[in-house]
Each structure stands twice: as structure tokens, then as C-alpha cells.
Amino acid sequence: MAEAFLQVLLENLTSFIGDKLVLIFGFEKECEKLSSVFSTIQAVLQDAQEKQLKDKAIENWLQKLNSAAYEVDDILGECKNEAIRFEQSRLGFYHPGIINFRHKIGRRMKEIMEKLDAISEERRKFHFLEKITERQAAAATRETGFVLTEPKVYGRDKEEDEIVKILINNVNVAEELPVFPIIGMGGLGKTTLAQMIFNDERVTKHFNPKIWVCVSDDFDEKRLIKTIIGNIERSSPHVEDLASFQKKLQELLNGKRYLLVLDDVWNDDLEKWAKLRAVLTVGARGASILATTRLEKVGSIMGTLQPYHLSNLSPHDSLLLFMQRAFGQQKEANPNLVAIGKEIVKKCGGVPLAAKTLGGLLRFKREESEWEHVRDNEIWSLPQDESSILPALRLSYHHLPLDLRQCFAYCAVFPKDTKMIKENLITLWMAHGFLLSKGNLELEDVGNEVWNELYLRSFFQEIEAKSGNTYFKIHDLIHDLATSLFSASASCGNIREINVKDYKHTVSIGFAAVVSSYSPSLLKKFVSLRVLNLSYSKLEQLPSSIGDLLHLRYLDLSCNNFRSLPERLCKLQNLQTLDVHNCYSLNCLPKQTSKLSSLRHLVVDGCPLTSTPPRIGLLTCLKTLGFFIVGSKKGYQLGELKNLNLCGSISITHLERVKNDTDAEANLSAKANLQSLSMSWDNDGPNRYESKEVKVLEALKPHPNLKYLEIIAFGGFRFPSWINHSVLEKVISVRIKSCKNCLCLPPFGELPCLENLELQNGSAEVEYVEEDDVHSRFSTRRSFPSLKKLRIWFFRSLKGLMKEEGEEKFPMLEEMAILYCPLFVFPTLSSVKKLEVHGNTNTRGLSSISNLSTLTSLRIGANYRATSLPEEMFTSLTNLEFLSFFDFKNLKDLPTSLTSLNALKRLQIESCDSLESFPEQGLEGLTSLTQLFVKYCKMLKCLPEGLQHLTALTNLGVSGCPEVEKRCDKEIGEDWHKIAHIPNLDIH
């Protein structure tokens, strides 16, 4: 860690010495001496870092060095702040304030020089070797791009097949809930194997639902049950007490052949496990639990089946994995390197994580000497813990370039199993000054490069892109490595980061302290803070003393109860990130927010702000501004955005306040890093003029890099001309809502990358999503070439997608939702698999559903007019597997063509108040049906004939159907003979 921080500090010193403002303070000679001393020490740091693992005295020496380096960094920061104040106030060199500051800093400079002289002298007794750690350039053959998927899994197909067969076949005869533990040391790939099993097609067909829970250290019954419920329902449960959670989970699992994966279990308390297991025993026969753990004791406590001990990879598979990471897609590898690689792989001991890590670090090295150094390095011989491969991983760390080392080690600040957000981590790296400047690159771009390098070297895993962010995790062993790297700075007195958390298993790491609760004295005690995280602290007020934390660069106040923030917060000249998202009572930011001259990220999502702070355009470093509320007064107008180089997403609201197109000059077309843009008008705003709004929206033309576009309540009579293939060439999602005056829709069909289109509450004049190409400047046979999801709401005159059908139109469309469009008629489409239809669709529209012959899922309902459904509706739906009718208030019977759906697996009928009967011939044709659910059909008289012949039917649910429920009484009911063979009955 130390040499990486010194590299940053030396750059800061060099920059400070070269700045003319150093003359104000007269510290040029002192800074040059500091730089010289640090440079001398830096030359031996690599050797010191390696030797500290065996020598406590060296570890203590590094602690002293870290402490001194932090102190120098503080002094430089204070000088920078004073220089800014000097420039702004235009004080003279001999102003008492300047003289006093020079005297105070001069005294501290003298003290730190004495400390460093002692540290430099002490280093001589250790006889360190000078080693220059060079930054390695990537080889020319390095693969470009970065794929968000786990690389190929080697050597686990046999294990996957064996366990899948055990889960599916052996447990069918089990009387008690089967629990199958996978046991193995850390890094063997237990989680990866469990993921393979979880996603195996045989498992998916056999179990429903499938639930995955990462248990980790915290085996809390309430937390686990809540997580399981959330995974099943895809939302957080609205109950709080344990008993309600238990009842809810049992309702969800009752009679279900579910699979529950409990990953990374550490709990060896039999009583805790018994309590959770008791709640889970309500499933159908065949329901199973798969658990992964490092500990034999956990397996013996939990398991009802013989544990599966995961073995090491074979030498062959280990070599394949190592070579894949080391050489990528390179077809021909240097045979000498391959020979050395085979020797390195032997050291990995068949542990996949070690092979991946070492292969990753050699990916960018092609000299034999570099590979031999890895093979022969003495760190291999260090003793290991019970389940640790830290020597191998520590070697990987020491081969990282300097600018990656402390960035990686910093990840130890997060608890194990934390799902981290890449973009947030980069801002924290920036706050601590870990990122070295590179030419004209923004610091965020440098951080992105660092993150990608660490990912390619296998330090990060489980990558997932969602909602504009990249989520990832760190393997437990990698986390152990990062934690071990803080041993040399654990006693450092200069705390740089405070996290207020009440997590039981969160601990202080090095310069990052964790406290259980906030108190005002906290701010007075730690004056050198770079990062302060007060999120979820239930705070209603922030003390004005926050303005005294002059070094603060990252302030997280999210999810608190603030109504306002103190104006003194605006004294934080170094603040880069201010996060107040989801402060639901915060209706204003400080008026002097524009004085936060270093601010780069202002995160305000979920705050009911009534206005944007005035003169926001003065924040020329600003990259993130979640939204902008247009005002009519100077300092609040749209022009404030003109000179901001914004990234990510922005929502611009109250555009009705823009007076004319000149005032609409926000220079959006130059904002190449803006990914998502939302623009909205207030429907109730006064003095709205259609022609003015057309000009305003024309002036808000975005950059061609835009990917997400939303337009809400636009009052113009036509959409802007920039909605075309040349400007929106990269857009993948468009949402248009409540633009009721627009007589036709833009030519969305020509957008080459458009995957998701949502149209809501449009003009009564619109009859087709896309008119003839005669209105378009761009003609193509492949209209909507990439569209996958289409959702249309409340277009009462909409007749269809296009006037003219064609095979080359909508070739990729998979999901459709047509909601409350009564005249809509479906064209012939060959790729649609999922359809949802709501509202009083007319008979022609219902019949046209048969044009979608590839449908596998259909939900249709909220129709209060139809008394019957057309026979031809189902005639060609031979692939349909899921069918749901709901809220048909006047539907009396179902079409006989329903019985032709021989691929149907699940049929749901709900809230059809007038439904009296099933088709006369029953449901005998539904030979694949496994699940039938009928709810709240109060007029239904009986279950269909032939139900007893449906041998695949395993689940029947009936509720809110009084006549049917009587006829299903066990043994005595008139319909009992129809359902007696069904294993899972839920009739109440």
C-alpha cells in the first residue's frame, strides 16, 4: 500500500512545487526536500512490502512512514485551500491571515521533516534492496472490450451432472426435507458449481420456484426469510415481525417443489438452523435445499444427504483455466512460456481461484524472466491458514502496477459479500487520491481503466450491469488478501474515512473507521477526513461544523430525514461527491452550492427538491447532476447547463418555464458522455404554447451517444426532427408519455439499436405506431430491426403497428403489451413470445392474437364488455405454455379452441365474475398441463370434465369459487374423482 500512496503524494508535491502559488507560502525548499526524501524511500518500498510479511519491525516502520505521508498530504491540502481563498479574496502577501498561516504551516513542515529524517535513517538498518516497479504496458495481443460474463468453467461438468441427478432422482423418495451440502475450501468454486446446477435446464424444469440466497456470516432467521420471500415475489415484503414473515413464506412454499440454494454458509449453531428448517418443511415432496460451505461441521449439522466434497481441479483443467486467463484468445502461445506455466500451475494446487489469479497477472507479460519470477518467488513458501491461498493471491497483488495496488486494497473497507457499484467505488478512489492523472483523461476515466484492469486480473467477479451501473463482488479469499494488506497501516492515527454503520460484522480497516452511531463530536475528532458516510443514520439535522472538514471530498448523506442542509457545507472547497439521494424530506439545497468548486457528482435522486440551486453552471467540474428544475429567474434557467460536461443521466423538468428556443440553449448536443435524458413539462403549467414548445424541444437535440430517451407531457403538435437514425443511432430505449397534441409518432422504426419502446397516453389522432415511409427521410425494409420489447398504453384510436405488414418488420420483437387500445389489431409477427393485453379490445383485435403463432405466454384481461371470446383466437397458438385470463367481468364461457393448446403448461383464470363453465368437451386436449389455478370466479359451477385424464397435472388451486369448492370436498365431493390424482391441491 505504501509505495502506491507515495507515488500519488510525489505527483502532488511536484505539482505543488511547480505552481506559482507556492511563492505565497515560501515552502519551495521544504517541498523539494520532502520530495527528495520520499523518492529515496520509495526506491526500497517494494522490498519492504515483501519483507514486512516476516518482520514485525519492518511492518512498524511502514506504519510510521504511512503516518508521515498522510500528514504531508494534509499539509498540501490545506495549502491548496488557503491558495484558493487567497485568490478569491485578493489579499496581499503581508495580510495578517496569510502571515499567520505561513507561520503555522512552517512549524508543521519542520516537525514533519524531523520525523521523515528519523524514518529515513531507520531504513538503513533493514538493508533494503532498491527495486523499481515499472508499470507494465499491455501486450499487443490483449483482448479488447470487457465482457460481463463469467469465463468458461473448466472441469466441473461431471460434478454438475452428478448433483443434478441426485437432486432430481434421489430426493423424490425422501420423507424429510432433503438438504444437500457442497463442502470445500475457499476458492474451489463451490458457488460457481452451485450456479451451474441452479441454471441447469433439468433443474429449471423440475423445480419451481428456484431461490438463491447468499447467507455469508449473518445467519439471521428473519433476514434469510425476508430475502427468500423477496426472491420469490420479486419485491420486498410489507411485514416486519418474524411471525408474519414465517407465515408469508409458508404460504408461498406450501405444496411447491422448490429448490433453495443457501450459498456460503458459516453458521454452525444447530438451534439456528433448526428454526429456519422448521419454516421450510411445507413444500411438496421433492423440494430440496442445496448448501455450500467451507466447514465440515456446517455440512454435518445441515445435511440430510451425504455431503459432496468438492475436489480440486485436475492438473489438465487447472492448466486450461490458467492458459485461458494468461493467453486469452491468442491461438499460438510461446512454448517456453507454456512450459513455465505448467510449473506455476502445480503451485496452484488445483484451486481454480489461484489459477485464474495467476493467469490474469501474467496476461500482460510475455518475457520468460517475468514468468520465471512468478514461478520462483519466495512468497509461495509462506505458511497458509486453514482455508487460505493468500500466498498465491499476495503474489498477484505484488505484480499489480502501482496505481492499481491501493485501489484494490481499499476494497477491504466493504464487508464480505457486498454487492459493490463500480461507479461509486471509483468516486471513493478519487476521494482518497488513489488515482494518478493520465494526460487529458478525466479521473473517472482513469478509475474505469483501473477497475477494468482489476477485473481482467480476476480480482472482481459476478459482474452485472443494471440501471446504468455496474455491480460486482469480490471473492472471499480476494477480500482476505485485501484485508491483510492493511496490517501495515492499521495503527495509523490519521483516520481518512468514517462509515457510520450498525452492521455487526463491519470492522475498521486501516485508515477507514467504522462507528456504530453518529454524534456531533465525531466531526471535531477526525479533522483529516476525506470520506464521511452518514447514510441511513436517521439524522434530521447536520451541524454547521461540517464546514470545518476542509479535506472532505466525499460526503454521503443519503437516506436521512434532513429538511435542509447548513450553508457552511459550501465551505468544503475539496468536496467532489455530495450524495443526498432518497432524503425524502429534503426540499432544498444550500443557496451557495455553486461555491463547491471541486464538486463532480451531485446525487439527488428521490429528493422532493422544488428548485435547483442557483448558478449551478459555475460548477465546471460537475459530471453528475441527476436532475435540473428549470426556473424563470436568472441563475435558474436552462442555460446553466450549457458549459457543464455532464455524464450518466439527467432529468430536466418544468420545461414549460422556458421562454423561447434561445433560452433553451443547454448545449446537449455537445454532451458526449450523457447516456440518459428525460425531458418533461408540467401538464398544469400556465401559458403553454404549442409552437413555442416545438422550438424548445428542437433546441434540446442530444448527442448521438445517447442511449435512453424520455419525453413527458410535451405540448407541441409534432415531435422534433432530431428523432431519426442519424442523431439517435445508439438509443436502445425510448419512452413517450402524455404527448397528447402530437398528431403522429416519430419514425422510431429507423432507429437501428432501439430495443425497448414504451408509448403511453397519446393523441386520439394516432392510428399507427409507424406511418408509411413516405414521411421518413430514411427508408429501410427492416423497420424496427432491433426492437425486443414494445409497450403501448391508452391510445384509443390505435389500429395497429404499421399500415403495411412485411416479413422484415419487427424481426426481433419478443415481448408486447397492448394496454387499453380497443381498436388494436395484431399483425403477423414471427418472433413474439410474450403478450399482455388489457382493456376492452374488440372482437377483431382478439381474433388477431392468433397471428402471433410463436407465443409462449399470454395474459389477457381487464375487459368489462366481452361476453365471449372468438373461437379463432387460439387456433394457431401451438407453442403457448402459459395462459392467464383475469378481470373479464361479463365473460360467461371459454372458447372450445382452448382445448387445442396441447403445449399449455399453466392455466390461470382469475376474477371472471360471470364465468359459469369450461368448454363442454372439458380440457382433455391440454395434455401438457401441469398447473391449473382458478380464483374468484363466483359463478363457476364445476371443474371441467376429463380433468382426471390429465396425467401431467401436478398442481391445482381453487379459491373464491364457492360452488366448485363444495364439489371438491375430499372423498365426498362431486368433483373429487376428477382431482384425486393431483399431488398438490390448494382448495380453500
Curated annotation (Swiss-Prot):
Keywords: ATP-binding, Leucine-rich repeat, Nucleotide-binding, Plant defense, Repeat. GO terms for biological process: defense response to other organism. LRR repeats lie at residues 526-548, 549-572, 574-595, 596-620, 638-662, 674-696, 751-776, 784-808, 829-851, 852-876, 878-900, 901-925, 927-950, 966-988. The keyword Transmembrane does not apply. GO terms for molecular function: ADP binding; ATP binding. PANTHER family: NB-ARC DOMAIN DISEASE RESISTANCE PROTEIN, PLANT BROAD-SPECTRUM MILDEW RESISTANCE PROTEIN RPW8. Disease resistance protein. Resistance proteins guard the plant against pathogens that contain an appropriate avirulence protein via a direct or indirect interaction with this avirulence protein. That triggers a defense system which restricts the pathogen growth. Belongs to a four-gene family located at the same locus. Although the four genes are expressed in the resistant haplotype, only RGA2 confers the resistance to P.infestans. In the susceptible haplotype, RGA1 and RGA3 are likely to be pseudogenes created by deletions and mutations, while RGA2 also contains several modifications. This is Putative disease resistance protein RGA4. It comes from Solanum bulbocastanum (Wild potato).
